[in-house]
Amino acid sequence: MAYKVALVTDSTCDIPKEWLEKYEITVVPMTVIFGDQAYMDGRDITPLEFYERLKTDPHHPTTSQPTPEDFVKAYEKATESGAEEVLTIVISSQMSGTYDSAVRAAQMFEKSVQVLDSHNNSMGLGWQVIAAARTREAGGDLAAMMESAKKVSAKMVYYVALDTIEYLSKGGRIGGAVKFLDSILKVKPLIYVKPETGTVAPALPSRSRAGVLKSLYNEFFKHIDTSKPMHITILHNNAEKDAKAIEARVREEYSPLEIFTTIVTPILGVHTGPGAVAICGYAE
């Protein structure tokens, strides 16, 4: 379909491939680096390959954000079918310099580009992109698409149960959470994303994996309005069994409007490490 407004995001969005295709969303890949080997997220390495390597590779991986030129190429691709405007929604500017690259590219591009800071990542970003896409499907213009994304952003609830603090402390952009969690290394950390600032903060940790997964579930449903239709994603870093068990429980206890489980992009897995499980979503 020829849309008047093109949609662009980055590869931390974790949006299922079928939705990317259905809504014609252009994705700008980030890069994960092991030593001197660089891999484009979603193209050169799969999440499963990444998490297996993460456990054994002596090099702690790093990530590289897209350049402004990468975004210009994405804008060109996204507008090939005739779109006159572009809406770009990306990972929190407090977690990555991707937002700055997208803005610089917008200034370089010949057509109008609006860039939104999602104040989030993974499906905390992805649900915003999907909301904008569905508004476009319903006939909404750029302003309506932006408003839909912003409403979802403000309602987003996103908790992550970590199996270890090791990867988080090695190099994530998480502000004061590292200092707090470093003092309690022997526990299983629980963290969450603050949608108003786009930063990560610590919640109450647990002394066991079972305990932190229980806290993950309880904290998420404490902060979301379960009386309204809910859109939920269960995310995991190669911990599908635990994630699927949570999905089954959510379906039984709450019957959300939408729910699915997916593995997390390597770009975020660099910081959260193997075994992490998250619940992310919003209520209408």
Predicted segments with their positions:
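Mixed-charge interfacial surface used for oligomerization/domain docking
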Residues: 3, 12-20, 26, 31, ...
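Conserved beta-strand edge residues that scaffold enzyme active sites
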Residues: 34, 92-93, 120
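Short beta->alpha junction loops
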Residues: 65, 117-119
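Short beta-strand segments
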Residues: 8-9, 88-92, 116-117
